[in-house]
Amino acid sequence: MSSELMFNYTFSWPAGPKDVILTGTFDDWRGTLPLVKTAKGNFEITMPVKLANKDDTFQFKFIVDGVWCVSDSYKKEHVSEGIENNFLQITDLVETQEVAGASRIPEAGGLLCGKPPRSAGPPSTSNRKKNKRNNKKRRSKLKKKSTKNNKKSNESLDDNEEEDGVTGTTTEDVTGTSREETPLAEPTNVSKEAPGNFHILPIDQSADTTKSNGIIGGPGPVLVPNPGEIKEFTEIRDVDARELNERLNKKEEVPEPVAGPIVESSVTEKSPALPQADDPIVETKEVAHNVQELTPQVEAVTPLINEPEPLPTPEAQISIPESSKVEPVEGSLQSKLVEKRESTEGVLDGSKKVENKAKKDEEVFTLDPIVNKAPKLPLTDEQTAEGRKSPAVSEEKEKKKKQEKGSKEVKRSETSKEKKPSAKEVKKQTVKASKKQTASPLSSSTEEPKKKKTGFFGKLKKLFK
């Protein structure tokens, strides 16, 4: 323990001034401790006073409204010429201490035997900060110390209380922690117990489950009635971790699925049968020969009298394949065509006949000609003989017929857009047509398909007459 003596003492100044400051040897006369104004108007402050020994004195002075002065209520001491200070001795400090249940020691100059109560001074910002720091230090120290070393813990508490006295606070104001308030456990005398006796909990082997107070909230130990029957208690397996990991992590090769043939059920279904006509159209040989003979005549027909001769357009030329061009005709065919051309010359002589013919031709070309609807004509012996003798010619005529049907449709679409010619133009066209027909067979070899058409219409007119 230190030899310093510490007492709490209350300094006061009567009411009147605005500001009072206490200074002395404790702060090297710097004037750092202001007095607190109470409700009565006077100024007071309670602070710990330290004395180095019994003969030591505590010197102090007041600064009232900025003036250094000495109080008449305290003892005065002349330090040097013209300088006075108030001072306190140990007797002055002991008289002010009032402790209930405490006894004084006469040999020690009236010092208290017990610890004096320490009244806290006025609250200040500096003291509050110090108190907070001290409380934190105290709690941290108490946590670190264990309960086994009781002597060390008691000494630390005494030191902390002394620190509280220095700052002007007491342990009464500070809320005590749980460890401070709880009493220490009394040490038990172990020597009284027998050396071989131990406290053992009773075990009930007949009970299926045992209940025990768990340590730190746990369920406690479990005693199994039949440990020999449980294989986990007896069997021990030695497993190589590497082999187990390799076996588990090994990826098995998955066989790729074989793609089988895809059957399209919806597409391959049988399409519904289309309704067929009861009497299918069958072309006889006689009808075919008749048509084959008439088709070259249709090709040789000149353009209509009342319509101008259409110029060949690139569309018409493209639509007609090369096979539709005039092929060299044998001598037998040329002689037959010349005979047919001579028979039709008499029909186209008069202008009246030509006009009537133009009207009839207009009616014919307004609708597509249908061969089946035309009245069947009796075949002559010459026509039947020609069909039997030249089967190759008939095949060529059929091909030409199919190709020229397309060219006819193109010509009709072009001629329908053009205007109808006047009467003068009709006469000119009739004269040109007559000149072309009277030409020699050699010079008109290139115009055979057009002249054949005139022969076809001429035959039709003869039959109707």
From Swiss-Prot:
Comp. bias regions, Low complexity: 166-177
BP GO terms, sorted: signal transduction
X-DNA-binding: annotated span: 160-161
Post-translational changes noted in the entry: Cleaved in the vicinity of position 160 to give an X-DNA-binding N-terminal subpeptide and a non-DNA-binding C-terminal subpeptide.
UniProt GO MF annotations: DNA binding; protein kinase binding
Region annotation (Disordered) ranges: 107-227, 247-276, 298-465
Function summary: Cruciform DNA-binding protein which exerts an enhancing effect on the cleavage of cruciform DNA (X-DNA) by endonuclease VII from bacteriophage T4.
Name of this chain's protein: Cruciform DNA-recognizing protein 1
Organism from which the protein derives: Saccharomyces cerevisiae (strain Lalvin EC1118 / Prise de mousse)
